From Swiss-Prot:
Stretches the record annotates as Disordered: 1-23, 168-321
UniProt protein name: Protein FAM47B
Disulfide topology: none
Amino acid composition bias (Basic and acidic residues), ranges on this chain: 1-11, 238-251, 288-299
Classification of source organism: Eukaryota, Metazoa, Chordata, Craniata, Vertebrata
Domain of life: Eukaryota
Record-linked InterPro entries: FAM47 (IPR032743)
Transmembrane segments: none
Amino acid sequence: MGDRRPQDRPRSQGMDSKPWYCDKPPSKYFAKRKHRRLRFPPVDTQNWVFVTEGMDDFRYACQSPEDTLVCRRDEFLLPKISLRGPQADRKSRKKKLLKKAALFSELSPVQPARKAFVEEVEAQLMTKHPLAMYPNLGKDMPPDLLLQVLKQLDPERKLEDAWARCEAREKTTEVPTESGKYPCGESCPRPPETPVSRLRPQLPKTPVSSRRPEPPKTRVSSLRPEPPKTRVSSLHPEPPETRASHLRVDPPETGVSHLCPEPPKTLVSSVHPEPPDTGASHLCPEPPETRVSHLHPEPPETGVSHLRPEPSKTQVSSLCPEPPEAGVSHLCLEPPNTHRVSSFLLQVLKLDSEKKLEDARARCEGQEMTTEELTKPGKYHFWESCPRPFESRMPHLRLVLPITRRMASLCLKPPKTRRVSSLCPEPTKTGASHLKELFQEDTPSTMECVSDSLQRRHTSRKLRDFKWAGDLGVNEESISSLFDFTPECRTTDQDQKIKKANECASRLMYGMELDDMDEVEFLRIKYWDRRRRAAPHSYSAQRGRIRYGPWYFEPKLGKKLRSDEPLIDPKPVLEKPDEPDILDGLYGPIAFKDFILSKGYRMPGVIEKLFAKKGWTYDSVKTPIQRAVQVYKYKEDVTDASKED
């Protein structure tokens, strides 16, 4: 039968063939037209513009479209090439999900919950606790005051270490100081502080007691060293201070108490600093004598100094129990350095916006005001000692003295004898052991604790010999004013100015002190500064668009113009008469032309341009030399004929 399916019939070439300009498609960088098919720009008849012949005059405005057929033209004749490839429309870029499509999105409900959880954790980590900026808050602050701050600012007890430290200190302070509760050598907890200033309590005087009674006040100043800090706690009696030797019997190191007679008092005294208020019991143990003594930091209240002589001992001796050897020291534990507590607490209390801690704020402000009043210069004479600063309710605030050479020079050294070395062996400590214990190392914390009032108080003792100067009306202000600079001599930043070479004085410019090389360098700098200065009428380049006339002008007629200047009319330029040449009215060029022609030489270009410009010919314009020669020759002939006759 055969295949009966309709076979494809051949078609003519014109039905499916494309035009010749579509065989090779244009570049993809050509900007596509909207709503119509892309055409090659020269072939697109809608962009054709028919213009008239001749030159257009665009001096005042565009040409009138009377004789010009202008078709609609949306774009320029040449194709636009974009740097980026063809891009889709902005509206079509954004893919918005419909309401129904949002329900069937690929995001699971767990992902938004996880995202919210991560944001919450990041917010908790980023927000810091208000007290997190002060890591040493518990060390530099008294426990009672820190506990009040923590109750208000940290009710959730996030700072566990600070809460535990404060509660532990409160428990130790609440336990009463009962006698006999603690064995020998252990430190007794500190009794609760009161608003009363930290004075050493007066103990009752008993015939048999390990406590030392307060001595009467006499004119002789008492100097008593501070007990050294050793590992073995012991209560040493004070050795006899005589001119011959120091007799001291060390008791055996046992737990049994011994009778330690106290020596009689002599005129020589020891420096005695006020012991710090700590948690230790208020017993006054006598330390062993060392080579270096200490100054008493407490100033005298009146003109009469404190007299603290040792009371005369009787046959009844005082009981001085010797504690066993242990790691616990008999000295009070050193409290933390809290000199900056007031200023530090004011910064912390700024977090208390509701001002609930009014007592703490008042205590801090009062402490700062008292320290400012005492450190004002010129309040006391230089031979008078500054009174002791006001004792605040801060129990751990202790002032530490600096180490100076003047302090070391005032230290009293007891005489050394053989009997001392045999009976009382020297302790294994350096000569400055007590000095290191009393005057701590020069750390930043200790140096900041030293106030100007303490320095003035210790240095004033040496100045008492100059009391006669005070009777004459000389005080610290009058002396310091002699060494003070006046406001005229004080330099400021405004007065400091670097002068140029031409601003120097003439005696410095032409001085003989300059060497040859220095003078050359100086002159070079001087004239270099002068060259940098611009002339008053110098040309300054102005940024602007410059053009050289229309494109149909001849290059010779082109002129440099700004974009805002009008164009030059070409017709007057062409019809403008030539300017008179300097050779036009001269007789010499015409005579020179005749001379060249008579000799048969080649005519110079200057003469050719002159005759071409004027439109002259060589025969029409001649000099009257020939006529003059003929007239002159005729006259000569006439004269010769007359002579012959």
